[in-house]
């Protein structure tokens, strides 16, 4: 891929510009550190858009995650590929177990403020760079209100906690993480505005806005999930 660059780029400004451009794209990914210091960090942010190819679970199992840029996710239900587990809880939504896309355009903002964009041609990469630098950097002001409702009733939740307490008293376990679900019906929502509100409120170092056709994933996490570098894994 051919590369072009711009210098002394502000991370938050360019993040907002990229999010402004995401609405017209079916496949878009933005991963940002929000400027948080980290000894393992290579970039302030990474982004990609356009899909040369979309990869699902079967393609990934047959070697689809070999070298080259790919953006996407591994779903929780993928665990059944590695262990024989009971499916006690119904899956929420219609998300696939895994999905990645090979981007047409890739960009990275390096730690020294250099924005580097790669495309199939230098002319195409330069066109994208100009588009990004000219996009609006304002925070969006669309609807972001969500009213969450618990899946469990109060009685079900208390019953589950009391059962776990009994297991601890019996010595079956000594600690446990218990998760409960909340859902919100989306009537009107600006996903970019919501992500910006989440990111500005948390400044979480592992934040991501991921758009895969009709699926949109927003993440503002303080924790790294996993990093693999050659034969080393950090988690």
Task: List the model feature ranges, each with a label.
Residues 1-235:
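Extended alpha-helical targeting/anchoring segments
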């Amino acid at each position: 891929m051919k590369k072009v660059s711009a210098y002394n780029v502000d991370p938050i400004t360019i993040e907002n510009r990229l999010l402004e451009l995401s609405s017209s794209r079916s496949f878009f990914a933005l991963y940002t550190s929000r400027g948080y210091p980290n000894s393992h960090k290579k970039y302030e942010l990474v982004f990609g858009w356009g899909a040369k190819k979309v990869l699902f679970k079967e393609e990934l199992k047959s070697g689809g995650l070999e070298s080259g840029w790919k953006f996407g996710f591994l779903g929780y239900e993928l665990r059944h590929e590695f262990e024989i587990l009971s499916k006690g809880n119904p899956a929420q939504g219609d998300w696939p177990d895994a999905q990645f896309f090979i981007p047409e355009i890739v960009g990275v903002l390096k730690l020294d403020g250099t924005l580097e964009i790669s495309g199939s041609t230098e002319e195409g990469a330069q066109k994208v760079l100009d588009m990004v630098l000219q996009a609006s950097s304002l925070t969006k002001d669309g609807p972001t209100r969500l009213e969450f409702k618990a899946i469990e009733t109060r009685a079900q939740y208390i019953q589950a906690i009391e059962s776990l307490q009994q297991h601890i008293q019996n010595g079956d376990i000594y600690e446990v993480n218990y998760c409960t679900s909340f859902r919100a019906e989306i009537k009107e929502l600006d996903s970019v505005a919501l992500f910006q509100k989440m990111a500005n409120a948390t400044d979480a170092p592992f934040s991501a806005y991921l758009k895969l056709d009709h699926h949109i994933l927003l993440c503002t996490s303080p924790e790294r999930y996993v990093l693999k570098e050659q034969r080393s894994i950090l988690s």
